[in-house]
A protein has these predicted regions:
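Right-handed parallel beta-helix
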Residues: 94-98
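Bacterial N-terminal signal peptides
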Residues: 8-15
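A cross-family detector of function-defining hotspots
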Residues: 24, 28, 34, 42-88, ...
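Positively charged n-region of N-terminal signal peptides that target proteins for export
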Residues: 1-4
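Sec/Tat signal peptide C-region and signal peptidase I cleavage site
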Residues: 17-21
Length: 170
C-alpha cells in the first residue's frame, strides 16, 4: 500500500509539473525582468536615486487610475500606476512598467537591446508571440508568482531585439 501511495503521489506530481510547463512555457524569474536596477515594484523614488530627475513627465488621471510616466530619454521611460483617489507622492509610487530602446541598460543576465533574441531563447526558452501595431515580440511571465506583469522583447526581421517593454494588463 505504501508503494502504491508513493507511485500515485509521484504520478500526480509529474502530471501537475507537466501541466504547469504546458500552461506557462514562457516563464522567466521576476528578478530577470528588471533593467538597470528598475523592475516591477521598484519605487519611483528609487529610480530617481539611480537616474536622477526625469527630463519629462506624463501624468494621466481618469478612469479610476493615476498613471505617472517618467521619461528619461526617447529610449527609456518608467511608468507607475495607482488608483485615481490615491494621493501617494510620486516618489512613493511603484513601478509597473518600463520601455527600453537602447543598449545602455541590461537585465541581470546581460540581455539588452541590440542582441539577438536567440540569446533570450537560450536562457528562458521561446516566449509567447505577440504582434502589436505591426511589431513582432515575444513575452514572458514571472516563473514563481501570480503577478500580472509581462516582459516583451520586440524584434526586427533579423530577430534582433529592438525594444524591451515591461508592463501589466493595463
Amino acid at each position: 500500500m505504501k508503494k502504491f501511495f508513493a507511485l500515485v503521489t509521484a504520478l500526480l506530481f509529474m502530471m501537475l509539473s507537466t501541466a504547469q510547463a504546458e500552461i506557462y512555457p514562457h516563464c522567466m524569474p521576476l528578478e530577470e525582468m528588471s533593467v538597470g536596477g528598475v523592475g516591477y515594484g521598484t519605487s519611483l523614488g528609487y529610480v530617481k536615486k539611480i537616474y536622477g530627475e526625469p527630463v519629462d513627465k506624463k501624468i494621466f488621471t481618469g478612469d479610476g487610475v493615476r498613471v505617472v510616466t517618467w521619461i528619461y530619454s526617447e529610449y527609456f521611460s518608467v511608468t507607475a500606476r495607482t488608483s485615481a483617489e490615491d494621493t501617494t507622492p510620486e516618489d512613493n509610487l511603484q513601478v509597473v512598467g518600463y520601455s527600453l530602446k537602447t543598449n545602455a541598460l541590461s537585465t541581470p543576465a546581460g540581455l539588452t537591446v541590440g542582441m539577438s533574441y536567440h540569446k533570450v531563447v537560450m536562457l528562458w526558452g521561446r516566449g509567447e508571440l505577440v504582434e502589436d501595431d505591426g511589431r513582432r515580440g515575444y513575452f514572458y511571465v514571472p516563473a514563481s508568482s501570480q503577478l500580472p506583469v509581462t516582459l516583451t522583447f520586440y524584434v526586427d526581421a533579423n530577430a534582433k531585439i529592438t525594444e524591451m517593454q515591461l508592463g501589466t494588463d493595463f
